[in-house]
Amino acid sequence: MPLDSIQHAAQEQFQKQSHRYAKGHILENTSDLAAVLDGLPIPADAKALDIATGAGHAAFHLARAGYKVTASDLTPAMLLRVREGAAERGLNVETREHSAEALPYEDGTFQLVTCRVAPHHFSSPASFVRESARVLAPGGWFVVIDGTVTDDFPEAEAWLHEVEKLRDPSHNRLMPPKEWRAMCEASGLTVAKLNIDYRKQPDLEWYFQAANTSPINRAAVRSLIATVSDSIRQEYRLAEEEGKIVWWWPTLALAAQKPVL
């Protein structure tokens, strides 16, 4: 299926930046995934699909847990990093190249579908949720971790969207919790966990480097930070520490189950 403009932008961005995600990246710490999976009744030999896997850190976590893992991504360079990383770790991870919105699997193929810190790049999050629900077996689990925005605070949402789009043009949208819940329910999934945590973004310069942000866009982001309203500054706890601009990023962790027939 041909890529749309948003998918093409994401593929182009991560094709160029794949080397930044393989080692020493913040996403190597998968304690967030472990927390949301904790207590879910997932079979020990479950077939798991990790969508938009990036460098494969979530997929490696699932493989270490004993699941039969397929790691998928839109970007060939990322999938190469996954294969290299799996080999280095002695893990068995299958890779597949495809978008998040059209999954090339039969209905009910997997007991677990995960997606970590990626849906804000998707052209159609609703299609992603619907397709994830389709490929889940009855009783299977859909698990998502991604940045989010506070429900019913459009000013803060618009500001963060502008910052993110300048930082990384492949960004599409961070969605509030109520929209995630609505998409799950519309796809026949029952939300069992929905938690919001705030993570410290400790250095604006690292934030730029991770996306190879242009000098012009870096200056634009700094201007947005310098002129931000008090309400948004408080929402994201924007501050300066030891000469570095820091803020606290809201992150959503969700687990939803496909009903048992």
Give each language-model segment a name.
Residues 173-187:
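Short alpha-helix
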Residues 125, 192-261:
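Conserved Class I S-adenosyl-L-methionine
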Residues 114:
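A conserved beta-strand element that flanks and buttresses the S-adenosyl-L-methionine
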Residues 120-121:
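A short His-aromatic
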Residues 1-44, 57-61, 78-81, 85, 143-166, ...:
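Conserved class I S-adenosyl-L-methionine
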Residues 49-102:
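Class I SAM-dependent methyltransferase SAM/SAH-binding core
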Residues 126-141:
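A short glycine-rich, Lys/Arg-flanked "PGG" loop and its adjoining helix->strand segment in the class I
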